[in-house]
């Protein structure tokens, strides 16, 4: 018995509709203990999921015991489980960010992107590929399938000084799924799931994906000079 609180983004990636690119939905289920069920840490979520309306209609779901992937099968008339998602690889050679916002980012974010784009000749000593679909659910599906990291940092523009994505119904459910798949999700420094949104539409910076790379980004944001390959005491490291 009892009731649950449902937080949902019914149409993620709506700017992709005109171009027939992937869009989707994001949802989160929370307990209703207390007077403000939507103002509790994301770690209290009971379940979270995304649905991608793409070449396949795919649902990714977690109940807090790993991550499941389902595909809508017309002949069956419903969703059929594909498999439990394999753990997200700790390291990656792919990153997703909207590079058109480069001039608005903090210097530390620019430094991370510059180091990746410098490839084998740069301080990372290896090649990276940059991705961007303008669809959070599609980015999540890609990262679950083959690893990678997603960044949507805060920037200097007034509407986005606290980030752009909504914590309650975008960042929290995606972070829950990612952590259940062995990845990491932060606001750049702090774990998203350890913080509670004060309002329904509170924005947050968001970084998620391969745990090793998410941790590296946190070091760029806090003390980039301490990163091994930028220290004169060390050679290149990936």
Q: What is the predicted role of each segment?
A:
Residues 1-238:
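IMPase-like, lithium-sensitive Mg2+-dependent phosphomonoesterase catalytic core
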């Amino acid at each position: 018995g009892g009731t649950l609180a449902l937080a949902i983004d019914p149409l993620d990636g709506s700017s992709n509709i005109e171009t027939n690119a992937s869009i989707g939905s994001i949802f989160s289920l929370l307990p209703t203990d207390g007077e403000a069920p939507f103002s509790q840490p994301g770690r209290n979520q009971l379940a979270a999921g995304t649905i991608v309306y793409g070449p396949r209609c795919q649902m990714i779901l977690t109940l807090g015991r790993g991550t499941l992937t389902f595909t809508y099968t017309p002949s069956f008339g419903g969703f059929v489980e594909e498999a439990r998602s394999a753990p997200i690889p700790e390291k990656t050679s792919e990153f997703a960010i909207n590079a058109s916002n480069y001039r608005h980012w903090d210097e530390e974010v620019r430094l991370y992107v510059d180091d990746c784009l410098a490839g084998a000749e740069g301080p990372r000593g290896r090649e990276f590929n940059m991705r961007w679909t303008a669809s959070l659910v599609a980015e999540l599906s890609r990262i679950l399938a083959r690893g990678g990291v997603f960044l949507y940092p805060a920037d200097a523009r007034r509407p986005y000084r606290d980030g752009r994505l909504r914590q309650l119904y975008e960042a929290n459910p995606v972070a829950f799924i990612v952590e259940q798949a062995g990845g990491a999700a932060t606001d750049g420094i702090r774990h998203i799931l350890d913080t509670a949104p004060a309002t329904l539409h509170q924005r947050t910076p968001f970084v998620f994906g391969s745990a090793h790379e998410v941790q590296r980004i946190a070091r760029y944001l806090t003390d980039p000079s301490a990163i091994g390959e930028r220290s004169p005491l060390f050679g290149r490291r990936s």
